């Protein structure tokens, strides 16, 4: 079980700390603005809390935001409302729909695009590569494949690596 590779995405995984922090901040800024522009919940939430989404530019700024609880999420999706207010893409872009287990009440629903799946798979590919897995190795995924995005994207990552 030696793939000879230390990294799946060497450019990202060996990035200098300052560059990595800058990339994280850039992606946070993008994500917050995307949520504001595309999610009915976040558009209203930012307005109600007098938060200018464009001013959130770093991971430190996230610490200043009010917490959104699981209960808040449940209150902004069916059956409490007529729509999924957290959904931030149009229906044709939704690749899969998932729910949490609902152990603390009504399950919370979330939506993934194909691009989201690829990001999840990339995360698992980095993990597998860092542990020495590569072409010809085998991995046993002991998680449920039903609506568990982890099991499915681990398998996608393994396939990409030839495992």
Give the residues covered by each predicted segment.
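Short beta-strand->loop structural element characteristic of the AMP-binding/adenylate-forming
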Residues: 109, 162-163
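Conserved AMP-binding loop of ANL adenylate-forming enzymes
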Residues: 129-161
């Amino acid at each position: 079980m030696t793939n000879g590779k230390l990294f799946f995405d060497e450019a990202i995984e060996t990035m200098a700390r300052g560059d990595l922090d800058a990339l994280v901040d850039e992606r946070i800024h993008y994500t917050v603005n995307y949520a504001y522009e595309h999610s009915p919940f976040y558009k209203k939430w930012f307005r109600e809390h007098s938060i200018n989404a464009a001013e959130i530019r770093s991971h430190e700024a996230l610490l200043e935001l009010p917490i959104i609880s699981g209960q808040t999420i449940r209150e902004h999706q069916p059956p409490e409302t007529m729509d999924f207010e957290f959904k931030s893409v149009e229906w044709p872009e939704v690749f899969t729909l998932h729910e949490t287990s609902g152990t603390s009440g009504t399950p919370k629903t979330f939506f993934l695009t194909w691009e989201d799946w690829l990001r999840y798979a990339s995360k698992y590919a980095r993990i597998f590569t860092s542990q020495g897995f590569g072409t010809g190795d085998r991995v046993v995924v002991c998680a449920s494949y039903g609506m568990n995005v982890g099991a499915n994207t681990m398998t996608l990552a393994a396939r990409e690596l030839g495992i």
